[in-house]
Amino acid sequence: MILEKNIDMVSERAILLMALGSLQALEHQAITIDESQRILFSPYISTHLENNKVSKRVIDIITECCELEDIFEIIPTKYIQQTLRILQNRIIKILKRYDEEPRKRWVIIDEE
């Protein structure tokens, strides 16, 4: 996925949906922390979002997810799923603040 330089509300919602999916995949051990960092949860992405004036609440949740590896090293294993669920619930609350997107499709395939 290529992050556009001009991130609009649709892109913010797409980022949140990608974060939500990544957290669920982590919870179900379908991806690793390293993979989630390559996908979305990295300081590089956080900085890119900041530079493109993405809302603070989106940047904050992505930045917090960037710290998951450190968090997992200090909390007992039994609290990892609970931590992931808390983050997922926060993302869901943020998503509910957006109006429904009227566009027919979010993803457009360029068939050159």
Please state what every model-predicted region is.
Residues M1-E112:
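Acidic, Ser/Pro/Thr-rich low-complexity regulatory regions
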